[in-house]
């Protein structure tokens, strides 16, 4: 694969990413935070809303970047497997993206990574390789 050049995203890229992500998951809900409003001393007409990414298929916002990356690199990936290193949320996100795009995925994780992350990545079809960080 040729070396990828980086470029500053434009607003059109954001709109395209939103459309890609919407094909694979529902938007995360907004939750009003009364506690933060009170802590900040906000008036009656001022609100604080938090985006709850715990509702995504992997419980993290990282799935969105993984889905968009996979979509934008399908031609470069071709029939080859995708490999990634992560100890948690990105491992799950890229594994989910690979499942959605029917790509083989190999995840390298430290042995000390949370077991729930191993299980979730594997549930999406990831092949896991571990290493000892000591």
Where are these regions (language model features)?
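PLP-dependent amino-acid enzyme catalytic core
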Residues: 2-134
